[in-house]
Amino acid sequence: MRDQRNQDQDVGTPEHRQATLPAEITDAAAGAEAVVFVCATCSVPLTGPLTRLPEVPEAPYYAWWDADEPGPSPATVPSGCYAVETEPYGGPLVVAQAPGPVMPRHGGHWNVEGKPLVSQGPRGNIVINPDDARGLELQHASPACCGATPDGGMNQLCACGTLVATLCSDCCLPYELHLSAEHVRAVRP
């Protein structure tokens, strides 16, 4: 499964796997100061230098049902960038009063009784391109056909054993890694 690849290596991600952003957003990111995200427990770097985007981009369109090979959708956030998620993301999922997206850039989700669900996960996650992560290990991910879903909450371990992030990598979902704002910190490179 793609999630279990060595994230320390440059895997040569094809261009179609990258998000394409409007020039005004990429220009703003180019002028921003880069930071490295480290584990709050052990201070090990979890990313290389990343520059902040003004907001999380919309997930690129991807016809996953027509893909030649199963795997993740194109990344929501371009390589070398990050953005802060302002809405709840990941588990736990709770019954909602009305149907709607279960979390940002996701469609509806229902429990076995047909009731709509919504994320009650944390706000303020740092959203990055999963290919920009270093040294993380997949832990107890909610499985789907081609990868991990964020439904069960954090699923990425630092080398020290601390859960630090939530990977979303199934073919029909946005390809994103959400670093937990409570478990990582930004430092200057």
Residue ranges and their predicted role:
Residues 1-189:
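N-terminal pre-domain and mature-chain start segments
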